[in-house]
Amino acid sequence: MRPYVILNAAMTLDGKIATATGSSEISGEEDLRRVHELRRECDAIMVGINTVLADDPRLTVHRVDAAPGDNPVRVVVDSMARTPPHFRVLNDEAPTVIGVSESAPPERVAELRKRAEVVVAGTRRVDLHLLLERLHGMGIERLMLEGGSTLNYSMLTGGLVDEVRVCIAPMIVGGRDARTLVDGEGIDEMADAIRLELKRSYTLGEDLIVEYTVKG
Ligand SMILES: NC(=O)c1ccc[n+]([C@@H]2O[C@H](COP(=O)([O-])OP(=O)(O)OC[C@H]3O[C@@H](n4cnc5c(N)ncnc54)[C@H](O)[C@@H]3O)[C@@H](O)[C@H]2O)c1
Ligand SMILES: Nc1nc(=O)c(N)c(NC[C@H](O)[C@H](O)[C@H](O)COP(=O)(O)O)[nH]1
């Protein structure tokens, strides 16, 4: 058993979720409120370690009203336990789970255990199936996946995503080194693409929101 997973992201019209230099303010004000409402409805928010290192996110509900207990559990996928102990994802605003692999240096794991629950899953990379199973065992039934591109790819190709919600902002930045909604190794044949079904589309200010379910 695993949680129901909603992938949420904001991208430019050309599919970038950050520029090559890591600048990533894409969503408009209204979309950011939508994101935080979605955070409030979920039991956990999951991101990859590169997103933590790039943005130092809080991963809490802070743009809409929230009672202290409304903050979801924060989950970082971090094979080598590189989450810096002073980063905001480890503050006391919400509980945090760090998913590491068996290859993570024990001294860094011990340091993280002072501030978070550490789940060891996988030998070199985090085994996402196993991590999600463990999260479900902790009572997490609805999980919001907030990127980045590399984790999005692994989660989608692992068959671990149920819905995709994307904010398309009216911006274009280009750049072959800029992260896109989904990177990773990529699928070779279009016939093998992950198929989605469009459920809803609407505008929020200048942004276009598109919501899909992933076909099983
Ligand atoms: N616009 C948005 O909605 C949005 C959202 C999130 C992140 N971002 C941006 O995305 C960028 C980071 O994306 P990224 O692709 O570099 O990194 P990421 O956040 O997807 O982290 C990927 C890393 O996670 C670790 N990992 C461990 N096990 C893994 C597994 N099984 N599968 C995949 N990764 C695994 C690896 O170290 C891997 O390099 C940042 O610039 C950030 O600002 C944008
Ligand atoms: N929906 C969305 N629109 C954006 O324009 C953007 N840059 C992100 N990025 C998601 C990523 O996880 C960010 O790191 C957090 O949004 C940081 O913000 P918080 O401190 O957690 O509120 N997400």
Swiss-Prot record:
In terms of InterPro entries, this protein maps to:
DHFR-like_dom_sf, Rib_reduct_arc, RibD_C, RibDG_C, Riboflavin_Biosynth_HTPR
Any one Gene Ontology biological process term?
riboflavin biosynthetic process
Residues that, per the record, bind NADP(+): T51, D55, S79, M80, A81, R82, V126, G148, S149, T150, L151
Pathway membership, UniProt: Cofactor biosynthesis; riboflavin biosynthesis
Q: Which residues form each disulfide bond in the chain?
A: none
The alphabetized UniProt keywords are: NADP, Oxidoreductase, Riboflavin biosynthesis
Q: What Gene Ontology molecular-function terms does this entry list?
A: 5-amino-6-(5-phosphoribosylamino)uracil reductase activity; NADP binding
Reactions it catalyzes: 2,5-diamino-6-(1-D-ribitylamino)pyrimidin-4(3H)-one 5'-phosphate + NADP(+) = 2,5-diamino-6-(1-D-ribosylamino)pyrimidin-4(3H)-one 5'-phosphate + NADPH + H(+); 2,5-diamino-6-(1-D-ribitylamino)pyrimidin-4(3H)-one 5'-phosphate + NAD(+) = 2,5-diamino-6-(1-D-ribosylamino)pyrimidin-4(3H)-one 5'-phosphate + NADH + H(+)
Q: What is its EC number?
A: 1.1.1.302
Task: Tell me the enzyme class.
Answer: oxidoreductase
Family from the record: Belongs to the HTP reductase family.
Query: What is the documented function of this protein?
Result: Catalyzes an early step in riboflavin biosynthesis, the NADPH-dependent reduction of the ribose side chain of 2,5-diamino-6-ribosylamino-4(3H)-pyrimidinone 5'-phosphate, yielding 2,5-diamino-6-ribitylamino-4(3H)-pyrimidinone 5'-phosphate.
Return the NCBIfam families for the record: rib_reduct_arch, ribD_Cterm
What protein name is recorded for this chain? 2,5-diamino-6-ribosylamino-4(3H)-pyrimidinone 5'-phosphate reductase
- Upper classification of the organism: Archaea, Methanobacteriati, Methanobacteriota, Methanomada group, Methanobacteria
